[in-house]
């Protein structure tokens, strides 16, 4: 029988990850996280590769996604995909708020470490 449990997560009470993200709802195959009011930084952060796929949506602010040699400007209303294993980094240009979903869940098994 399928699990029909409904889980509600209030972001004000969500745990924070090591990089400042708030962990939201999480299932067996996908998890959500919130990047809230991330401040503009002095430049591109170091590139990383993750063993999960990420899709995101910009709520407010601006950022630049550097993805496998491409430059993608992100603004409110934009969404993006970072494939599993792709080299990428983000540069916050203007105080930035976005929500992301990761599959498999980024917070499991230490996948979401800086």
Where are these regions (language model features)?
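A short glycine-rich, His/Asp/Glu-containing loop-to-beta-strand
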Residues: 11-47
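Short strand-coil-strand connectors
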Residues: 26, 66-70, 93
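Surface-exposed loop/turn positions
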Residues: 28, 41, 78, 86, ...
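Short, conserved beta-strand element in jelly-roll/cupin
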Residues: 49-65
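Short acidic-glycine-tyrosine-enriched beta hairpin
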Residues: 69-84
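Ligand-binding loop in jelly-roll beta-barrel domains
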Residues: 84-109
